[in-house]
């Protein structure tokens, strides 16, 4: 009887469990010739394709992905957006969660497929993301989403159609592409001492072309702001590139530049190609389609739209939001926007327009959305956005998503999920260029090398002092605490204009609870909220893993933002700018969350000891001459009341 009772209890327990499937995948990373935009170059293929294969799972699947490095250089793979709850060793960051995967070696990543939604995977080894190591990653949700769809339409047919579309989305990987490899591009920057950010193509799912419109057309398509404030006495090049030798772009370091070192075809010398544009087929019988856009771009902000088809953004960075209707949306490096599109127009071929938003270059990519059975029909259309990212219709000005427009950026989580009213720990990070046009800091002066601690990942040494200078690159937090990260931009010497920074936190999402203009002058966030409550939102702020800092081409005395999160997932997590050029220039910091309850690392992920194969473990780099550094000390003490790499006691409590 006792055994039967025990068996019955066991069966009840088993019946209540949600069994997760174990799903295994293999990725082979290779360096080969390719021509995604019609121009041949060396690049990275994953399983023989670019972008890498789509990885699709169900929520809470136990994922096991074996990565084989068939290249002649190091690599890792980061699973961007995956929570990595309890598996920080699978995050794929050299020097934090693992050593590099060396040539000929393999690495097994094991983690839970969570949270549901749209994510992606990419290299986290220097700038090789832009060489092609990236792909889409999608997790189908368990939950019934009908309440979400009812906010778009109350028609039961529409709700059913959207439910189906969300589980079988069209994954749309956006990337920018250059004829130069990442190493060649960075060498051009170092040799010329100029920040270069011009590309040849914008691709969708690995397809695109090089367009060379007449220069007069490009000049007429240039956004008014950059033209008048950033380079008022010059024009864009025949590639649509902003002029490289311009103080409004390079800052005071333009006088140190060597423009003759810029290789041909980076800034000018447009060569058209015969590539091919991507076509996505949709079935009008389905009623709706979900297009999930992934910004795998290195430094471009793409203003995507579909001619004649408004769209509803319902998911941002793998987090469901209150749906918002737009006709165009600007998406920036690292972000993911999932949109619902109603298929109710005349069947035919409609252009998907993919221009740079106008903040870095006059360039566009194109693709096609084709109604099934109407491939050869081209209904008359009028674009929402033009080649240069300008408004093509009146509604574009009022119904577009622009991250600088705080009202348009109001997309609170669904269901509601507000943060705590107060924080336990606060850290001020003063960000910007430090000592040159292409070196970037997150901590006033110190640069985070891309190979920092490559052979001694901080996962294994969370409480060990990493060196006097290196300590400026590390923040340690306690488990369960609420943390505020205060980001200050456009106040460092020579960096008065607020350039974009796409800030991505690994390991957890953050709420953006506040924005403001000027220099951060408060001893705490609580004091700031009391002084200017209109600058904060604690009721229903947005929740994302990637946020864009404020942008202004005109020096305005600085801008600040406050991001809040709770430490619930102990581990070493990178916080960095997702513009590859800025990260390569040093704009990262290590957040060692929950050092008081650090997880036990499985034996299979222990540090390996072997001769170096081209990997360097570099120290933090103070990048300034002594006079500049002394000036910075005086500035930080007088204006912000803190020293570089430090916070006031109130900020570090």
Swiss-Prot record:
EC category: oxidoreductase
Top-level taxonomic group: Eukaryota
Residues reported in the UniProt entry to bind Cu cation 4: 501, 577, 582
Chain residues that bind Cu cation 3: 506, 576
MF terms in GO: copper ion binding; oxidoreductase activity
Sequence positions that bind Cu cation 1: 504
Pfam families: Cu-oxidase, Cu-oxidase_2, Cu-oxidase_3
Keyword rRNA processing included in the entry's annotation: no
Limits of the Plastocyanin-like domain: 31-143, 173-362, 463-594
CDD domains: CuRO_1_Abr2_like, CuRO_2_Abr2_like, CuRO_3_Abr2_like
EC number(s) from the headed UniProt entry: 1.10.3.-
Keywords assigned by UniProt, alphabetized: Copper, Glycoprotein, Metal-binding, Oxidoreductase, Repeat, Signal
Signal peptide: 1-20
PANTHER family: LACCASE-RELATED, MULTI-COPPER OXIDASE
Functional description taken from the UniProt entry: Laccase; part of the gene cluster that mediates the biosynthesis of ustilaginoidins, dimeric gamma-naphthopyrones isolated from different fungal species. The first step in the biosynthesis of ustilaginoidins is the production of gamma-naphthopyrone precursor YWA1 by the non-reducing polyketide synthase ustP, via condensation of one acetyl-CoA starter unit with 6 malonyl-CoA units. YWA1 is then probably substrate of the ustZ to yield norrubrofusarin via a dehydration reaction.
The name this protein goes by in its record: Laccase ustL
Protein's organism: Ustilaginoidea virens
Taxonomic classification: Eukaryota, Fungi, Dikarya, Ascomycota, Pezizomycotina
């Amino acid at each position: 009887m006792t055994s039967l009772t025990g068996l019955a209890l066991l069966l009840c327990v088993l019946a209540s469990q949600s069994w997760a499937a174990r799903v295994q995948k293999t990725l082979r990373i290779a360096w080969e010739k390719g021509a995604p935009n019609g121009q041949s170059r060396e690049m990275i293929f994953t399983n023989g394709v670019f972008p890498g294969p789509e990885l699709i799972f169900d929520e809470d699947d136990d994922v096991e992905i074996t990565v084989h490095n068939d290249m002649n250089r190091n690599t890792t793979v980061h699973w961007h957006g995956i929570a990595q709850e309890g598996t920080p060793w699978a995050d794929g960051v050299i020097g934090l969660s693992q050593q590099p995967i060396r040539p000929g070696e393999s690495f097994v990543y094991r983690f839970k497929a969570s949270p549901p939604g749209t994510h992606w995977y990419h290299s986290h080894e220097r700038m090789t993301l832009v060489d092609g190591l990236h792909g889409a990653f999608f997790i189908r949700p368990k939950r019934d989403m009908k309440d979400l769809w009812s906010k778009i339409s109350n028609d039961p047919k529409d709700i059913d159609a959207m439910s189906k579309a969300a589980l079988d989305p069209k994954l749309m990987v956006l990337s920018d592409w250059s004829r130069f490899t990442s190493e060649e591009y960075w060498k051009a920057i170092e040799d010329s001492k100029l920040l270069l950010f011009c590309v040849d193509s914008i691709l969708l799912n690995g397809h695109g072309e090089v367009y060379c419109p007449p220069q007069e057309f490009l000049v007429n398509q240039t956004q008014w702001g950059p033209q008048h404030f950033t380079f008022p006495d010059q024009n864009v090049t025949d590639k649509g590139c902003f002029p490289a030798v311009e103080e409004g772009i390079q800052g005071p370091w333009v006088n140190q530049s060597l423009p003759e070192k810029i290789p041909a075809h980076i800034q000018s010398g447009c060569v058209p190609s015969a590539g091919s544009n991507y076509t996505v087929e949709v079935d009008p019988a389905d009623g709706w389609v979900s297009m999930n856009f992934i910004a795998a771009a290195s430094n471009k902000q793409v203003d995507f739209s579909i001619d004649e088809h408004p769209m509803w953004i319902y998911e941002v960075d793998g987090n469901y939001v209150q749906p918002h209707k737009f006709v165009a949306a600007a998406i920036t490096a690292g972000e993911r926007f999932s949109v619902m599109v109603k298929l109710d127009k005349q069947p035919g071929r409609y252009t998907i327009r993919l221009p740079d938003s106008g903040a870095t270059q006059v360039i566009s990519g194109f693709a096609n959305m084709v109604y099934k059975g109407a491939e050869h029909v081209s209904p008359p259309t009028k674009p929402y956005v033009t080649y240069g990212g300008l408004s093509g219709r009146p509604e574009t000005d009022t119904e577009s998503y622009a991250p600088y427009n705080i009202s348009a950026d109001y997309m609170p989580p669904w269901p509601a999920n507000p943060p705590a009213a107060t924080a336990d720990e606060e850290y001020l990070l003063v960000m910007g260029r430090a000592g040159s046009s292409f070196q970037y800091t997150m901590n006033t002066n110190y640069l985070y090398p891309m190979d920092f601690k490559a052979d001694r990942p901080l996962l294994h040494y969370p409480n060990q002092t990493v060196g006097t200078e290196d300590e400026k690159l590390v923040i340690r937090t306690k488990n369960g605490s609420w943390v505020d990260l205060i980001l200050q931009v456009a106040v460092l010497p020579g960096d008065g204009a607020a350039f974009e920074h796409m800030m991505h936190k690994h390991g957890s999402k953050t709420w953006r609870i506040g924005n403001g203009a000027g220099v951060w002058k408060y001893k705490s966030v609580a004091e700031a909220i009391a002084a200017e409550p209109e600058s904060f939102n604690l009721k229903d702020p947005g929740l994302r893993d990637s946020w864009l800092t404020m942008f202004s081409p005109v020096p305005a005395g600085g801008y600040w933002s406050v991001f809040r999160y709770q430490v619930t997932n102990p581990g070493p997590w990178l916080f960095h700018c997702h513009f590859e050029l800025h990260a390569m220039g040093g704009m990262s910091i290590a957040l060692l969350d929950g050092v008081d309850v650090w997880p036990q690392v499985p034996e299979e992920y222990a540090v390996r000891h072997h001769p170096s194969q081209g990997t360097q473990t570099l120290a933090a780099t103070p990048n300034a001459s002594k006079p500049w550094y002394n000036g910075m000390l005086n500035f930080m003490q007088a204006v912000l009341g803190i020293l570089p790499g430090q916070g006031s006691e109130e900020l570090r409590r």
